[in-house]
Each structure stands twice: as structure tokens, then as C-alpha cells.
Curated annotation (Swiss-Prot):
The active site is at residues 47, 58. NCBIfam families: trpA. Pathway: Amino-acid biosynthesis; L-tryptophan biosynthesis; L-tryptophan from chorismate: step 5/5. The keyword Magnesium does not apply. It comes from Chlorobium phaeovibrioides (strain DSM 265 / 1930). This is Tryptophan synthase alpha chain. Belongs to the TrpA family.
Length: 267
């Protein structure tokens, strides 16, 4: 069986820059050219959001992107079809970077567990991040995902106790995903009680209690913040800022141009 792209990438000694993108945002037809632009501009891993009608853990930008994605015809079946085309180079240059799906469990349950894993693997999906899947209840799903060589990523937050950090580190296949602050996705402002120093101490604590790599997301919007997070973590995730920078695009080509221009400012 071919080695998982994420597993292969994480063996390299490099700091990672991950892009979060909501399919078919801001206009229908944007996904393939945007994926190409992100790959060409240096995205190491691309997270694709699974649009959901009630994304309670997301900030307003990602909520709006999800609603527009659904309005533009994206379902989980459609998303896998788009990824398959991207992997084959149909409608864009062949996409070879790892692709991770991030979303809620409901669409996967509706799809059917093994059916989804089969179709996702065939499409070229490398991993899954399901924020509402508790690690304590994930054992059976982890075993099935392992059978498909699918990476599964779990979340760590600033209030996660050390023993739970260690459990999450052990259960995450290749890396874990740290929320930088206690907030909805894309909130750059620190929450009450959070300071730059407290966030740094939190990430140092995560490092002490993990053996695998971890990335940091939520609220990272420019090169300065990326480089700051790289001091403590193995990767930085930029999502809301990317969506904001392409939101005004009226065509797929303009969305791709704006995505590429923005992404190059982060490297």
C-alpha cells in the first residue's frame, strides 16, 4: 500500500505551513484553481472544510464560507469528486500535497463509515480532523481508518490537562492540532485571561507532553504570527485570513490569484 502523504511529509525536518480552505468559496468552480495556487505558493498541507449547515465551533467567516459552499453545490460526495479530479490533474495541475478533511461527524455518519473511508481513500484524501469526535469514543473509527492508511488528528486546547494531552498525542496518527486560544475558529483576538506569554507557555506545555509533532491553528493571519508559532510548534495553520483575502473574488481565476498572492506573503 502506498505510504500516506502526511506520514511521509512529517519525516522531513521542516516547519509546516497548512492552508484551510472551504470548497467552492467564494464562487462555484473555485476549488481546483485555488488548490493549484496554494500548492504552487508553498502550502505543505491543505485542509478542506466539510461544509455543514450548523458549524457551531466556527467563527463568522468560516460559517459564511460554509453556507456559501453549500449554496454552490458542495456535499461530501461532491467534495470527494473534486479531490479526485485534483489528484488526477483534471481542471488544474495535478495536486500532490497532502489533503486533510476537517469537519463534523454528521456528514460522515450520513455517508456511511466504511463507504466514506473507501471513497475518501480512492479520491486521494490523506487524513481527517473531526472536532466533535471525542478521543475516548474513537477507538473503533481509528482502527477502521488505520486499515485505510488514513491519518486521524485530534484537538488540544489551552485547557487540556497534561494527562489528556498525552492521550491525544498517543491517539493522533501522525500529529495533533492545537487551538491557539479558547475561541471559535479564526478569532485572532486573545480571549479574556489569555496573553501572548500564556499562549507561549501553553505551547511549551504541549511540547513537554507530546512525542509526535503538533501544529497550531486559529487566529493566525500573517507571516509574523506564523513565525512566532513556528518557534513552539511544528506547523502553523492559516484559514480564516485566507478566506477573507479571497472573499471578494468574482471568478474562480480571481480567487486563485488572490489565494496565491496572499499565501506567498506568509512564507
Amino acid at each position: 500500500m502506498t505510504e500516506n502523504r502526511i506520514t511521509a511529509l512529517l519525516r522531513q525536518d521542516k516547519k509546516l505551513l497548512l492552508a484551510y480552505y472551504m470548497p467552492e468559496f467564494p464562487v462555484a468552480g473555485a476549488t481546483l484553481p485555488v488548490l493549484e495556487a496554494l500548492q504552487e505558493s508553498g502550502a505543505d498541507i491543505i485542509e478542506l472544510g466539510i461544509p455543514f449547515s450548523d458549524p457551531v465551533g466556527d467563527g463568522p467567516v468560516i460559517q459564511e464560507a460554509a453556507h456559501r459552499s453549500i449554496a454552490n453545490g458542495v456535499s461530501l460526495h461532491r467534495l470527494l469528486d473534486i479531490v479526485g479530479r485534483a489528484r488526477r490533474g483534471e481542471g488544474c495541475r495535478k495536486i500532490t500535497v497532502p489533503i486533510l478533511l476537517m469537519g463534523y461527524c454528521n456528514p460522515l455518519i450520513a455517508y456511511g463509515g466504511d463507504c466514506f473511508l473507501t471513497d475518501a481513500t480512492e479520491a486521494g484524501i490523506d487524513g481527517l480532523l473531526l472536532p466533535d469526535l471525542p478521543p475516548e469514543e474513537a477507538g473503533e473509527f481509528l482502527e477502521r481508518a488505520k486499515a485505510f492508511s488514513m491519518t486521524v488528528v485530534f484537538l488540544i486546547s489551552p485547557v487540556t490537562p497534561p494527562e489528556r494531552i498525552e492521550m491525544i498525542d498517543g491517539m493522533s496518527t501522525d500529529f495533533s492540532y492545537c487551538l491557539a486560544v479558547n475561541a471559535t475558529t479564526g478569532t485572532a483576538k486573545l480571549s479574556e485571561g489569555d496573553t501572548e506569554a500564556s499562549v507561549d507557555e501553553y505551547l511549551k506545555r504541549v511540547r513537554r507532553h507530546t512525542k509526535k509533532k503538533f501544529v497550531v491553528g486559529f487566529g493566525i493571519k500573517d507571516r509574523e504570527r506564523v513565525e512566532h508559532m513556528w518557534r513552539f510548534a511544528d506547523g502553523a495553520v492559516v484559514g480564516t485570513a485566507l478566506l477573507q483575502n479571497i472573499a471578494s473574488a468574482g471568478t474562480p481565476q480571481e480567487a486563485a490569484r488572490l489565494a496565491g498572492e496572499f499565501w506567498r506573503t506568509l512564507r
